[in-house]
Amino acid sequence: PGAAYAAAVANGESERAWIRRVVLLLTGQAFSLLGSNIVQYAIWWWIVLQTKTGSAMLLATLFGVVPQAIVSICGGSWADRHSRKLLIMLPDMVIAVVTVVLSLSFAMGWASLTMIFVVLFIRSAGGGVQTPAVQSFIPDVVPSGKLLRVNSIYGVINSVNMIVAPAVAAVLINTVPLWSILL
């Protein structure tokens, strides 16, 4: 079992208390991932609608995906050596700050494709740190006999998210300004 789970049992905590922690973690991640992906897809939809060029969309996709793929290679080892909670929360805060800055830039008419690409890059790199940390954190709070089930639920959450987020973003981008979606 995970270290946090074993410590909780050693301190007399109910074995079923892990369920509360897992529900909080997975619920938080579900909403965080959904919001983050809606923002990502809304930005991509906005770029397509505004530029009408495949090259701008290609660059947006590269800046929005490649950094996460590269950073996540190291993200797993960082999660093994550093505080997983910090590696989950810190990138989330950085992502939130740069997204709010982009939102304000759109609201004030200052946004540019370059700024969007920089924000996509930062958001993607943050995801490359956060995602492996979450995946490494789950075994810490789940009994080993329940790990497969919880990981399966986490996988379903991610799969549903990948279906729902683009659709929600498409509806939103056609009904409200991008700056409000980013908030």
Indicate where each model-derived feature is located:
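Alpha-helical transmembrane-bundle signature of multi-pass membrane transport and export proteins
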Residues: 1-183
